[in-house]
Curated annotation (Swiss-Prot):
It comes from Photobacterium profundum (strain SS9). The gene is queC. Catalyzes the ATP-dependent conversion of 7-carboxy-7-deazaguanine (CDG) to 7-cyano-7-deazaguanine (preQ(0)). ATP binds at residues 8-18. Keywords: ATP-binding, Ligase, Metal-binding, Nucleotide-binding, Queuosine biosynthesis, Zinc. This is 7-cyano-7-deazaguanine synthase. Binds 1 zinc ion per subunit. SUPFAM superfamilies: Adenine nucleotide alpha hydrolases-like. It holds the Pfam family QueC. One of its GO terms (molecular function) is ligase activity, forming carbon-nitrogen bonds. One of its GO terms (biological process) is queuosine biosynthetic process. Its EC number is 6.3.4.20. It catalyses: 7-carboxy-7-deazaguanine + NH4(+) + ATP = 7-cyano-7-deazaguanine + ADP + phosphate + H2O + H(+). Its cofactor is Zn(2+). Pathway: Purine metabolism; 7-cyano-7-deazaguanine biosynthesis.
C-alpha cells in the first residue's frame, strides 16, 4: 500500500496537492500546523476540507514555539501585511524556519506511519520571495531527512514549476476548480474563497485565475507538457 503525508494548510496550493495525492496514493494522511498564525480560521478550513474530501487521518500539530521565535506579519496581529519588501529583500509575511520545521516534522510523521512521500505545495515560480520555497532548499532538506532517519523518503513538490494559472489548470484537470476556488483560504486577511482582493496572496491568486479562465486551452496545454516532462 502506497502512503503519503500532505502538508496541509487549507489554501489553494495544498488543497490542489491533496486532490492529486488522493488520486495517486492508496492512503493519504494530512498534517496541519498550528503555529499561532494570524487566522485560526485556517485550521478550521483545513479540517473542513479534509472531511469533505474523505480524509480520515488528519493530524493538527501545535508548534507554537515557532510563533515565539519568528516575527512576521503572519504571526503578529499588530504587523500589517505589506506589499513592499523589507530591507533584507523579503516580504514581511515570510516566517523564517517555517518550512524547515513543517517538512522535518512531516518527515518524522511519514517515518512513523511508513509513508513513502511528503507532499508540499511550495512553488518556486510564484514563491513570493520566500527562500524556503525554492527547489534547491527542498532537495537539500530531503537529503538531510533521508540521511538523518536512514530511510527512503521523497518530498514531492507537484507545483514547484507551475505558475498560478497552471495550478488552477491542475485543479480543473481533476474537475475540482470550483471546489478549490470556493472552499480554500489563501487570503492573508482571513477571507475564504476569492478573499479580500487586496493582499499579496489574493493578488497572485486572482491574477492566476483570470489568466487561466481567459486562456484555458493554452494554459492546459502548457500544464500537460510540463506533466509529460515530469515537472508537475
Amino acid at each position: 500500500m502506497r502512503k503519503a503525508v500532505v502538508v496541509f494548510s487549507g489554501g489553494q496550493d495544498s488543497t490542489t496537492c491533496l486532490i492529486q495525492a488522493i488520486k495517486n496514493y492508496d492512503e493519504v494522511h494530512c498534517i496541519t500546523f498550528d503555529y499561532g498564525q494570524r487566522h485560526k480560521l485556517e485550521i478550521e478550513v483545513a479540517q473542513s476540507i479534509t472531511k469533505e474530501l474523505g480524509i480520515t487521518a488528519h493530524k493538527v500539530m501545535d508548534v507554537g514555539l515557532l510563533n515565539e521565535l519568528a516575527i512576521s506579519s503572519l504571526t503578529r496581529d499588530n504587523i500589517e501585511v505589506s506589499h513592499e519588501l523589507q530591507a533584507n529583500g523579503l516580504p514581511n509575511s515570510f516566517v523564517p524556519g517555517r518550512n524547515i520545521l513543517f517538512l522535518t516534522l512531516s518527515g518524522i510523521y511519514a517515518y512513523q506511519i511508513g509513508a513513502e512521500a511528503v507532499i508540499t505545495g511550495v512553488c518556486e515560480t510564484d514563491f513570493s520571495g520566500y527562500p524556503d520555497c525554492r527547489d534547491e532548499f527542498v532537495k537539500s532538506l530531503n537529503q538531510s531527512l533521508v540521511l538523518g532517519m536512514d530511510r527512503a523518503l521523497k518530498i514531492e513538490t507537484p507545483l514547484m514549476w507551475l505558475n498560478k494559472a497552471e495550478t488552477w489548470a491542475l485543479a480543473d484537470q481533476y474537475k475540482q476548480l470550483d471546489f478549490v476556488r470556493e472552499k480554500t483560504l489563501t487570503c492573508y486577511n482571513g477571507i475564504i474563497g476569492d478573499g479580500c482582493g487586496n493582499c499579496p496572496s489574493c493578488d497572485l491568486r486572482r491574477a492566476g485565475l483570470e489568466d487561466y479562465l481567459t486562456n484555458k486551452d493554452a494554459i492546459m496545454a502548457d500544464l500537460v507538457a510540463k506533466q509529460a516532462e515530469g515537472q508537475a
